[in-house]
Amino acid sequence: MARPKLHDFRRLVVKVGSSLLIDSGAGEVRADWLAALAADIAELHRGGRDVMIVSSGSIALGRSRLKLPRGALKLEESQAAAAVGQIALARTWSEVLGSHGIGAGQILVTLQDTEERRRYLNARSTIAKLLEWRAVPVINENDTVATNEIRYGDNDRLAARVATMASADLLILLSDIDGLYTAPPGSNPDAKLIPEVESVTAEIESMAGAAGSELSRGGMRTKIEAAKIATSAGTHMLIASGKIDHPLKAIAEGGPCTWFLTPANPVTARKRWIAGSLEPKGTLTIDAGAVSALRAGKSLLPAGVIRVDGQFARGDAVIVRGPDTHEIGRGLVAYDADDADRIKGRSSPDVMMILGISGRAEMIHRDDLVVGTAPG
């Protein structure tokens, strides 16, 4: 598989860990380094790319602001430190991106936000709107409310979930090491950097070591887990050193890193999941005009729906049938069954009047629709 280039990608997630962002001695943001990273992000943004940031650092900053001693914190202490640190972290990102004329939007998520369908859809919609407005979403785990039972515990896997949620085509994990090695490079002089990984095998997993610095909760093992999540969803991933200034520029110029490649892309992977992995909860029957529109690559609008069957929630998979009951495709519906039935056959301006809210224009967006999935 040909090794891609950074500028081949249109939507990127950049994960920044605590050990890069925070000076472990002073407990403060590494301002010069962050300014250089922000300049890299601004360059990508000016090129028309969508950029999202998954940023650690709230607990580390909170510890510094509260002058807490070194060592392990109890859960409630970590949560309280995060509450203080998150304010400073959000301000830092807002100011450094704002210096380039870029707005930043803070999103705090928990594991449940990516596991529960409704919350997942709400988070995805918020990210999509921020990107549409050309803002940069800055995402972190909501450490103030996450417990040990319902937390990611590291932002590598969170970043992979965000990349999947946002249909990003590249996830960049900036680390204190420039990629995956055949052995720990600090203790083995014969260790070699692996430039490309086309499949995460048991051998690849065995090369991952334990967690690193005091400030970071992640390590190479969590990065390998992130690679499995990302590549299965059609998102390429790379691990590169963030210790240098302008780390994204270094990647673009061919600097050392490890690519985790996937033959799929986010849209095809998502559509394969919709077509083959989800149990349909209902059926939408559509008119002949809507059938033609769907086959031409359009979204399904409420006006084209003539019948709604089944009990389904927003985001559930449904079968789409033509007026002759032949299956046209499958998709993720934007309304629950009751609301879908109320707005079927109606034009988009009528939807707000009927539902009393400004609803989505599409019953099923084309990115959530697979046409031609009927058996046989």
Curated annotation (Swiss-Prot):
GO terms for cellular component: cytosol. Substrate binds at residues 56, 143, 155. ATP binds at residues 15, 175-176. It catalyses: L-glutamate + ATP = L-glutamyl 5-phosphate + ADP. It is found in: Cytoplasm. Its EC number is 2.7.2.11. GO terms for biological process: L-proline biosynthetic process. It comes from the Bacteria. PANTHER family: GLUTAMATE 5-KINASE, ISOPENTENYL PHOSPHATE KINASE. This is Glutamate 5-kinase. It comes from Rhodopseudomonas palustris (strain BisB5). The lineage of its organism: Bacteria, Pseudomonadati, Pseudomonadota, Alphaproteobacteria, Hyphomicrobiales.
